[in-house]
From Swiss-Prot, chain A:
GO molecular function, one term: hormone binding
Region Disordered, annotated ranges: 37-64
UniProt record, GO biological process: adenylate cyclase-activating G protein-coupled receptor signaling pathway; digestion; hormone-mediated signaling pathway
Annotated PANTHER family: UROCORTIN-2, UROCORTIN-2 AND 3
Lineage: Eukaryota, Metazoa, Chordata, Craniata, Vertebrata
The protein's role, per its UniProt record: Suppresses food intake, delays gastric emptying and decreases heat-induced edema. Might represent an endogenous ligand for maintaining homeostasis after stress.
Signal peptide: 1-23
Disulfide-bond pairs as recorded: none
Propeptide span(s): 24-71
Subunit structure: Binds with high affinity to CRF receptors 2-alpha and 2-beta.
Post-translational modification comment from the UniProt entry: Glycosylated.
Gene: Ucn2
Subcellular location: Secreted
Protein name in the entry: Urocortin-2
Record PTM Valine amide, positions in chain: 110
Curated annotation (Swiss-Prot), chain B:
Residues bearing glycans: 204
Pfam families: CRF-BP_C, CRF-BP_N
Top-rank taxon: Eukaryota
Species of provenance: Mus musculus
The UniProt record lists the keyword Ligase: no
UniProt name for this protein: Corticotropin-releasing factor-binding protein
GO terms under biological process: behavioral response to ethanol; cellular response to calcium ion; cellular response to cAMP; cellular response to cocaine; cellular response to estradiol stimulus; cellular response to estrogen stimulus; cellular response to gonadotropin-releasing hormone; cellular response to immobilization stress
Keyword Oxidoreductase recorded: no
Signal peptide coordinates: 1-24
GO cellular component: axon terminus; dendrite; dense core granule; extracellular space; microtubule; multivesicular body; nucleus; perikaryon
Amino acid sequence: MMTRWALVVFVVLMLDRILFVPGTPIPTFQLLPQNSLETTPSSVTSESSSGTTTGPSASWSNSKASPYLDTRVILSLDVPIGLLRILLEQARYKAARNQAATNAQILAHVGRR
Amino acid sequence: MSPNFKLQCHFILILLTALRGESRYLEVQEAAVYDPLLLFSANLKRDLAEEQPYRRALRCLDMLSLPGQFTFTADRPQLHCAAFFIGEPEEFITIHYDLVSIDCQGGDFLKVFDGWILKGEKFPSSQDHPLPTMKRYTDFCESGLTRRSIRSSQNVAMVFFRVHEPGNGFTITIKTDPNLFPCNVISQTPSGRFTLVVPYQHQNCSFSIIYPVAIKISDLTLGHLHGLQLKKPAAGCGGTGDFVELLGGTGLDPSKMMPLADLCYPFLGPAQMKISCDNAVVRMVSSGKHINRVTFEYRQLEPFELETSTGNSIPEYCLSSL
């Protein structure tokens, strides 16, 4: 029991160290626990608890061998949805400019015939 | 003016317009011989086919809506980077590794996610995607170049990456493939029109618009026609059978959104709802026994519409998130 608790404390300390990045500007990654009760379509086989973790593999490599640690972590991006809209608008603008350049090239080809 | 004379005038006008165009062309080309078939010549097609793909540098936080080749090169340690990919609704996205120079042992990574995930919320949601969340990630450091291409299940995908060493990075090529029956879609634009069709498939499909919008549904078909008689599903709502639901929320995951309206039976004619949430979703639940189809238009709400509460809207829930 003492060994188990020591291991849990060790993992918590590691997690705390990994998540704390002083001075890191937005955006940041979220390392979120995977809820084992998450609903999945009935046609999909449920993933076993021994599945490999994602995230920085070097930092979590020891979790594979741990019989006590059943928390899996998924990688997510911690930015607001408003920023996503801004990025989307920028992407559309660049796409429109690229299309205009392509059209100009096509017209140049046609004009030379 | 007699109809015949009018027709003759129109004909003359058409000829004059054509002559004017030809004249302009002759002015530009001087003595060149006019040949309209040149537009379809093989040389022209070859010239266009040899166009270089779209290329640009990738930023640490980026959004791409065009196919092409993209290169990220770190000029300093870049620890929290992601690129979002979005195609047309009827397109799959393929991400191909052309060149990868990262130090996996040193903590670098390059992971592709099948969909978008933001603040822990995923699109498509776990309920609507065939794979569990963990299997939606493809890790370059695990698969290496044995799996150089990853294809998404919908029109969106994203890649997470971390590069410690300046000068390291990667080059990827983004391609798109046609998707005949788009199931899960994020709209590129805040306004548009779309028809979601689920033909005899037991699946749930969502169309997501990450803007406050007014949605006008013009046609909802649940079941297939036998002649002129529409066969209704046995059960329409209450979480069973075939139905459409409108959802609103502040994140990406439809399963975490507020249900705003359930459409349990087929109908024709406009049915409009204003959803002033950050994200609005039209979601179709299909039993697989029928061909289900919903056609709708959406437009971004104006600022003054967000301020006032009129008509068929639910402002209390959504405005609190603004």
